[in-house]
Amino acid sequence: RALLKARLLDIMIGDFDRHRDQWRWAKFPEKELWQPIPDDRDQAFCRYEGLVLALARPRVPILQNYSDHYPGMEGLTWNGRDQDRQLLAGLERPVWKEVAQELKSQITDEAIEKAAHRMPPEYFKIDGARLIHDLKGRRDRLVAGAEAFYEYIADKVKVYLTDGPEYVEVKRLDNGDTLVQVWRQGEDGKPTGEPFFRRTLHKGETQEVQIYLEGGNDRVVTLGKPNSITVRVIGGRGHAVVDDTKGGGTRLSDTGSGELLPGPGSHLDRQPYTPPLPPKNASWIPPRDWGRDILFVPWLSYGSDLGALIGGGIDTQAFGFRKEPYSSRHIIRAAWATAESTFRADYKAEFRFENRGVYVGWYAFASGVEASHFFGFGNETGDGGNQNSDVFKSRQLQYGFTPSVFIPIAKDLTFSLGPTIKYGSSQHKQDLALINLQRPYGYGDFGEVGGTGTLELDTRVEASKAPGGMAFRSLGYPRGGAEVRVTGQVWPKAWDVLETFGSVEGRAAAYLTPGGDKAPTLALRAGGKKVFGNYPYFEAAYLGGGLGGFGPSAGDEPVRGLQRHRYAGDAAIYGNADLRIYISQFHIFLPGSWGILGFGDVGRVYYSLETSTKWHAGYGGGLWFAWLDRANTLSVSYGRSEGHNGIYARAGFAF
């Protein structure tokens, strides 16, 4: 109760930074329990105001804006999440309301006004009245704030035992609730004295209770039929006996000598568990296995081929027990391409299993930009000096769906395999368009069904964080590591496919940074594609310079300055080199850094009905800007190839 009272004061004054190191604990002779002593309240009354911070708040919820109302509890309590869920687990809702009401009655108007007037007079003139108003508002809403806090940590309850022998009883009640009680265990294996932990978990509030046995020879007994509240028992260093014969449905995770006496639906998992690396500055915090994050994701870019691609979507992640980095994830986006007056939408999903590396997912899309141009087949097709002419436009709507199984082979190496279905519908408005005149195989409505397999190695990191600290993956500005991806597809004779064909495509990129934050980065990439058999035109190996493909196996097209799909053939090969140089720091709304970049590209296609030795080259440069962190990078560049120009703006870089 003393800790809860202190935490309620924390949320009332808006101090979000209440991590474990900001508490002291004292033992008084007249009290059996250690008493909490709050320390270093240095983030109270913070007002992170402004449009930019409001946009950043969903991703960084601790950027609180103090007012007379309580914000979401995640940001307000995030830094103390491990301690809250461990030490407040034994308190039920009535206790929270009672302690909140007690604290509310002690914080009088007089106390608030007196405290505010202790500020320097000059500062009180600026903000004193607003601070008094906000404090009184939060004080008046303290009971509601306490209930929101309670509900936030009640979804998954964690019960930690000690290193001594304990007796745990889990009783599922007829009304759907679950009663958990913990006693000291006597020499006869029976409970002794009064329970030192007792809590009734209510359906609709709690999804799961996790009982951590720690050391000692503990005994857990379950009673009653399983209900909506999942019961997990996590074995410790001692020998535990979990008697589920009178209950059922209990899940025991124990890599030691634990024993499960099973009931209906019981499950024992003895597979070793290796948790992910914890935060470098908070190594005691366990992996997140509760709650859900829902974020807005913008989808913004510009290329001379598509114009502005404007849109966005949501990225939602749910977290579960020993399902890392999340139990499920859904990314749903849609965008409009202004130059082509068409759209693209996609949906990527992942589903993880408990304490297993293998996971499943799918990728689905609907798009009018996948096959936007057609110049014919060959490495030397002409464009009449105008690669942007409507003659070369190829309007096709494509729909695709690929469910996959993902199998980790080694650290950072994953293999995925699954069926693929794709359907295209041509919508050509220009009668004199080249594709209307040639009508290649695949023209019109075309459906295909096949299989896709991908092998991916990804060790990209933000080099400035290594070796001094834990490196993290940064796709916005990779400065170290490498990425290798190889994808194979087979399309058998079925639907509109006249004969079986297939393809293999791959790319490899490496990032070299000889130094720290201000050192330049040399990014190198090589790749290609080979198509086998008689294939529809939109499955050809293309070489172009647009913003590139968008699917999970697609990379940016590799010769900047060219039009999308400028050259098509049976095979394509390319190479890219980018030099990204830091110039200086800046402060526009938020602190950041900026620099310049230069690039050179080269590539060609091969076509069975043509003999060509020509290579297509592109070159250019631009600027990059990074706010707060290099992961938040925006690049703007200009490319030129064969007398044609391209302008590109995007999050991150081309690769």
Model segments located where?
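Catalytic-loop signature of eukaryotic-like protein kinases
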Residues: 15, 20-27
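C-terminal catalytic region of ATP-dependent kinase domains
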Residues: 26-198, 203-208, 216, 222-230, ...
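Outer-membrane beta-barrel initiation region
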Residues: 49, 212, 222-223, 234, ...
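C-terminal outer-membrane beta-barrel translocator/porin domains of Gram-negative envelope proteins
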Residues: 282-294, 341-350, 362-394, 399-404, ...
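Membrane-embedded beta-strand positions of outer-membrane beta-barrel proteins
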Residues: 298, 330-334, 360-364, 415-419, ...
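C-terminal beta-signal and adjacent terminal beta-strands/loops
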Residues: 598-613, 629
